[in-house]
Regions:
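C-terminal/domain-terminus segments
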Residues: 28-45, 107-109
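Acidic/polar-rich alpha-helix caps and helix-coil junctions
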Residues: 3-30, 61-355
Length: 355
């Protein structure tokens, strides 16, 4: 993701390159500001929870809500433990505590001066993240690229081989109602091995058709939000797509294709919040980060389980206590009003008539 010339990455099938002082962009500049400014971007707990553990099994392997059986490899919802023993792609997507996530502050690009900000939870202040899960995927940490401002030349990957494998797996399953082990090895297991799973140490990390892992947490969400049932194998195909393509602008279109828009109504949550004493600076010590005094029910808000509620006071009124609205008419786009005026025989798509 962090390349200037797509030709240096054999996985890239279709990409865009930019020319310094001719055609550029501000992606790194905005990414850095959005990752550390009042735009407050961050990954959701829903995404983080979907990453498997290093043994290829979910964080919960049995039981029911309120009494789930926890995977021994899952070390719990602690800032210093949650990302450990997980699918290697998790820490290729989300910052570990102590990693640099910004080198821009007050118009000055200086990695050493600005230091490390993680998680910096104040959802409505400069230098913050709304979820606590800072994104590292796509981030170059390159002072030169930052200083180019609107003339950045980081290449844009539009289509890559990893996505092709995921498309192949999904299409074959939808066509045949199943997937052969050979196809799973060619696609999902190939992606897992490339990511860093150790199949020799953890044989269960290799997906086996007919022996898919149980995931009571995710199955419960699907049962509540979807009006159709999916098999364990299809669940794993969709999981693989979500984690492999995370933060690559594919999720919304995937949900529309799967007729799974109601998954957008799963409450948006962030990391588990404990106390201010858990927030440290970049020294990897117990030194408190004085600059980020976080007050419960004032600068951050949590649910009954202690997880951060995202955008609890959204000025845009898009959320209700961290929950997005959804109506099925949104599976279709509205016909533009000017088209309706030009052709009175056109009928607006249902649900959009008065919007």
């Amino acid at each position: 993701m962090c390349i200037r010339d797509r030709s240096s990455n054999p996985e890239v099938i279709l990409g865009r390159v930019y020319l310094e002082n001719k055609v550029g962009h501000a992606a790194q500049r905005y990414f850095n500001q959005n990752n550390s400014n009042r735009q407050s971007m961050g990954a959701t707990r829903g995404l983080v929870d979907e990453y498997l553990c290093i043994d290829g099994r979910p964080i919960y392997t049995g039981g029911n809500e309120g009494n789930y059986e926890q995977n021994p490899n899952f070390l719990g919802y602690g800032k210093w433990t949650e990302l450990e023993n997980r699918d290697p792609r998790l820490t290729q997507t989300i910052c570990r505590p102590g990693e640099h996530v910004t080198i821009y502050q007050g118009g000055v690009v200086d990695k050493e001066k600005n230091g490390i900000k993680y998680p910096d939870l104040n959802y409505n202040a400069s230098g913050s993240t709304v979820t606590g899960y800072r994104v590292i995927k796509h981030w170059m940490g390159d002072i030169v690229e930052e200083d180019r401002t609107t003339q950045g030349i980081q290449a844009a990957i539009e289509f890559r081989y990893g996505e092709l494998l995921l498309m192949y797996a999904e299409a074959k399953y939808e066509l045949n109602g199943t997937l052969s082990q050979a196809d799973v090895d060619l696609t999902i297991n190939a992606l897992r091995e490339r990511a860093g799973y150790d199949f020799n140490k953890y044989p269960t990390a290799r997906l086996i058709v007919g022996n898919e892992p149980t995931d009571p947490r995710l199955d419960k969400i699907y049962a509540e939000k979807l009006d159709y049932k999916i098999s364990p194998l299809l669940r794993e195909i969709r999981r693989e797509r979500r984690v492999e393509m995370a933060i690559e602008n594919r999720r919304y279109e995937d949900l529309m294709r799967w007729k799974a828009g109601k998954l957008l109504t799963v409450p948006l949550r962030g990391m588990k919040f404990t106390t201010v004493q858990d927030l440290y600076d970049g020294t990897h010590t117990t030194k408190p980060e004085i600059a980020q005094q976080v007050e419960l029910d004032k600068t951050v808000f949590v649910d009954e389980e202690g997880f951060l509620i995202c955008y609890p006071k959204s000025p845009y009124q898009n959320t209700i206590k961290g929950t997005l609205p959804w109506e099925d008419y949104r599976y279709y786009w509205p016909i533009p009003k000017e088209e309706l005026v030009m052709n009175p025989n056109l009928i607006q798509n249902a649900g959009w008539e008065n919007r």
